[in-house]
Curated annotation (Swiss-Prot):
UniProt name for this protein: Zinc finger protein with KRAB and SCAN domains 5
C2H2-type zinc-finger residues: 346-368, 374-396, 402-424, 430-452, 549-571, 577-599, 605-627, 633-655, 661-683, 717-739, 745-763, 773-795, 801-823
Sites bearing Phosphoserine, chain numbering: 335
Residues in KRAB domain copies: 218-291
SMART domains recorded: KRAB, SCAN, ZnF_C2H2
Database matches in PANTHER family: ZINC FINGER PROTEIN (PTHR24393), ZINC FINGER PROTEIN-RELATED (PTHR24393:SF100)
Pfam families according to UniProt: KRAB (PF01352), SCAN (PF02023), zf-C2H2 (PF00096)
Keywords: DNA-binding, Isopeptide bond, Metal-binding, Nucleus, Phosphoprotein, Repeat, Transcription, Transcription regulation, Ubl conjugation, Zinc, Zinc-finger
Domain (SCAN box) ranges: 51-132
Length: 839
């Protein structure tokens, strides 16, 4: 835009003055035409309509009615009621008021981003505060704060103000004598710098107000650093001299590039060399125009690196992070000429990866160098990125900031919360291109793909033909077309495909310099794209079936070292994962997670057909076989199918042992006792028909058998000796001890053995003098509550045990059993009924 400036010129020649006025009028006319042309191609923005509405003045209209109508038009242009809903209009009004009440130092930064909602404005402010906090934590030392290599020609620091101030100096005026900064200066708020523009002018403005003893430096080629005079006093004379030499060298580099005039340069060098305590000065007016040099494009890339340097004003002695100095040294050695196709950025010399921002390039370089500058103060673990250290520190603090809105479960990392959401939604975005199976987690897909590779390796021949390589190259090109971002990477890696020896193996894991990522060959998830920087790589051993990690105890081998570590806990008995609620420990984290659902009551796996919920996914899979009728586990001996593996295991025991239950009538032998009972009922029914006995007892026995069958279906754990079934395996184990007479639990007082742990506690109460359970009727005390309940039947007259034959009632079960034996001697059918009832 052409700017006109008024000048006071004393001239006695009228024609010259007239021509000057005509020239000014011509310039203004051209400016108006340029504005009209720009408005056609650059329509007013939301901020423009807002400013028109807020800055409208009454005198701009001819009268009150026109002023009101004009305001209505401007308000409609701002709020756009024909496009926005009432909620959106209210949001705009709230946003306008929110921007008004913001502190003055935040308002220009937020308005520069043009937020369209209150949430966007809040996000901008939070980002500013977060960067401020990070920069305060990254303290740098005073003398070494600006390393020599940092003074690159393009590294120019932006101004602290969102709108840089430019002070034009008249060429005919002599340079003014610079003034020293006042000793009493307020610290200037360090806010994140706005992106540099091509036409932005560099300034070295010095701010000084207030009462605190602080001196502010605006570095031209480096960063803005604030020093307290007390901090400067901690430095010795050699350190002060070193800093002045660095300053001279930096300004010399800038002058050589044309960023500073020679007069101003000599003046600044003289000021830096001054031995007084006020070491830093700057001219009040300095003209700095940015030359159109190609190296100046490097400034925006160095912005992320420059922002990492900051001095903490609350600390007396400054510190320097050595890794930051090495990072800056590495940055200055990188030239923008290394980029391909004229792009600005940095390319890694080890793996060829390209980065636009210098900060991302620095983080990537630590992968090759193995540097881990961020160390945990609690356990000493080190990390190559600060975000990883922050996530690790939450393990010590117990902080879990990411909470699920559905079940309330909290997580330390946001990615874990995203994975957890798929449990509620049932979404499985990661699909296998080979078999079409979907998975909820990327790691599960990787493990599944390894199985395909092992299967293919067994089917492939030993030939190393070119057709195999060409087919893989073709598949890589197909996926490179699906994702243009990977095209360059795929072309680089196609030439690095290794020999496909036994099993079509491929170099899946990048050896820091070469290799093909697995996902470039097998594809990506079905419903969303994955970040290729986070894709793990399949090692060559997964396709060949090699298991290099071997257990020294039992000789078992594993593909991954993590699986070996988990396996070794079985031998060592180590259980590092402990439940905070009940104190139980587990050797794997997944087992602890499943156990914690017992306390929380969480059942994330729901059956879509009947709505029944389960704590473990495998239980849901077993339950779904009830609806489908599928019985995948079949017996090789008799061909019988089962819905659960445990049922098949119990069935196989029947084939492995002898038939021990024999019928006395016909001599037939049975595996299970309940089968013998069913068979004997048939014999009793035949006898009843011959003798003409009432069929009521016979039908009652059949009912008992049918009830027993239903019971067995719901209770999968069955005793091989007596046929009794249980719903839980632990109950079956305790029941086996009644047959084997095993008593593994011993009393510490009398050394008596008992079969169950609960019986041990009950037994030990005999030796305790306290009888906590007392009868209210007679005052008698008992050690066990069950004994008290039996005693109270004497007072109440309760007789809960009834004989089904004669209807006689008894107070105790032992009395009922004695009574039933009298019926056994008279009626053989009742013998079977008693046995059936006991079962």
């Amino acid at each position: 835009m052409i700017m006109t400036e008024s000048r006071e010129v004393i001239d006695l020649d009228p024609p010259a003055e007239t021509s000057q006025e005509q020239e000014d009028l011509f310039i203004v006319k051209v400016e108006e035409e340029d504005c009209t042309w720009m408005q056609e191609y650059n329509p007013p923005t939301f901020e423009t309509f807002y400013q028109r509405f807020r800055h409208f003045q009454y005198h701009e209209a001819s009268g009150p009615r026109e002023a009101l109508s004009q305001l209505r038009v401007l308000c409609c242009e701002w709020l756009r009621p024909e496009l926005h809903t009432k909620e959106q209009i209210l949001e705009l009004l709230v946003l306008e008021q929110f921007l008004t009440i913001l502190p003055e130092e935040f308002q220009p930064w937020v308005r520069e981003h043009h937020p369209e909602s209150g949430e966007e404005a809040v996000a901008v402010i939070e980002n500013i505060q977060r960067e401020l906090e990070e920069r305060r934590q990254q303290i740098v030392a005073c003398p070494d704060v600006l390393p020599r290599k940092m003074a690159t020609p393009g590294a120019v620091q932006e101004s602290c103000s969102p709108h840089p101030l430019t002070v034009d100096t008249q060429p005919e005026q002599a340079p003014q004598k610079p003034r020293l900064l006042e000793e009493n200066a307020l610290p200037v708020l360090q806010v994140p710098s706005l992106p540099l523009k091509d036409s932005q002018e560099l300034t070295a403005s010095l701010l000084s107000t207030g009462s605190q003893k602080l001196v502010k430096i605006e570095e031209v080629a480096d960063v803005a650093v604030s020093f307290i005079l007390e901090e400067w006093g901690h430095l010795d004379q050699s350190q002060k001299s070193l800093y002045r030499d660095d300053r001279k060298e930096n300004y010399g580099s800038i002058t050589s590039m044309g960023y500073e005039s020679r007069d101003n340069m000599e003046l600044i060098v003289k000021q830096i060399s001054d031995d007084s305590e006020s070491h830093w000065v700057a001219p009040e007016h300095t003209e700095r125009s940015v030359p159109q040099d190609p190296d100046f494009a490097e400034v925006s890339d160095l912005k992320g690196m420059v922002q990492r340097w900051q001095v903490n004003p609350t600390v007396g002695k400054s510190r320097q992070n050595p890794s930051q100095k090495r990072d800056l040294d590495a940055i200055t050695d990188i030239s923008p000429k290394q980029s391909t196709h004229g792009e600005r950025g940095h390319r890694c010399s080890d793996c060829g990866k390209f980065f636009l921002q210098a900060s991302n390039f620095i983080q990537h370089r630590r992968i090759h160098t193995g540097e881990k500058p961020f160390k945990c103060g609690e356990c000493g673990k080190s990390y190559n990125q600060r975000v990883h250290l922050t996530q690790h520190q939450r393990v010590h603090t117990g902080e879990k900031p990411y909470k699920c809105q559905v079940c309330g479960k909290a997580f330390r990392v946001s990615s874990h919360l995203v994975q957890h959401h798929s449990v509620h939604s049932g979404e499985r975005p990661y699909g296998c291109n080979e078999c079409g199976k979907n998975f909820g987690r990327h790691s599960h897909l990787i493990e599944h793909l390894k199985r395909h590779f092992r299967e293919k390796s067994q089917r492939c021949s030993d030939k190393r033909s070119k057709n195999t390589k060409l087919s893989v190259k073709k598949k890589i090109s197909e996926y490179s077309e699906a994702d243009m971002e990977l095209s360059g990477k795929t072309q680089r890696n196609v030439s690095q495909v290794q020999d496909f020896g036994e099993g079509c193996e491929f170099q899946g894991k990048l050896d820091r310099k070469q290799g093909i990522p697995m996902k470039e060959i097998l594809g990506q998830p079905s419903s969303k794209r994955m970040n290729y920087s986070e894709v793990p790589y399949v090692h060559k051993k997964s396709s060949t079936g090699e298991r290099p990690h071997k257990c020294n105890e039992c000789g078992k081998s594993f593909i991954q070292s993590a699986h070996l570590i988990q396996h070794q806990r079985i031998h060592t008995g180590e259980k590092p994962f402990r439940c905070e609620e009940c104190g139980k420990s587990y050797n794997q984290r997944v087992h602890l997670t499943q156990h914690q659902r017992v306390h929380t009551g969480e059942k994330p796996y729901t059956c879509p057909l009947c709505g029944k919920a389960f704590r473990v996914r495998s239980h849901l899979v077993q339950h779904q076989s009830v609806h489908s009728g599928e019985r995948p586990f079949k017996c090789n001996e008799c061909g019988k199918g089962f819905g659960r593996r445990s049922h098949l295991a119990g069935h196989l025991r029947l084939h492995s042992r002898e038939k021990s239950h024999q019928c006395r009538e016909c001599g037939e032998i049975f595996f299970q006792y309940v089968s013998l009972i069913e068979h004997q009922v048939l014999h009793m029914g035949q006898k009843n028909e011959k003798n003409g006995i009432c069929e009521e007892a016979y039908s009652w026995n059949l009912t008992v058998i049918e009830d027993k069958k239903i019971e067995l279906q719901e209770q999968p754990y069955q005793c091989d000796i007596c046929g009794k079934a249980f719903g839980y395996s632990s109950d079956l184990i305790q029941h086996y001890r009644t047959h084997t007479a095993e008593k593994p639990y011993q009393c510490d007082i009398c050394r008596e053995n008992v079969g169950q742990c609960s019986h041990t506690k009950q037994h030990q109460k005999i030796y305790s003098s306290t009888k906590s359970h007392q009868c209210h009727e007679c005052g008698r005390g008992f050690t066990l509550k069950s004994h008290l309940n039996q005693h109270q039947r004497i007072h109440t007259g309760e007789k809960p045990f009834q004989c089904k034959e004669c209807g006689m009632n008894f107070s105790w079960s032992c009395s009922l059993f004695k009574h039933l034996r009298s019926h056994e001697r008279t009626d053989p059918i009742n013998t079977l009924s008693v046995e059936g009832s006991l079962l």
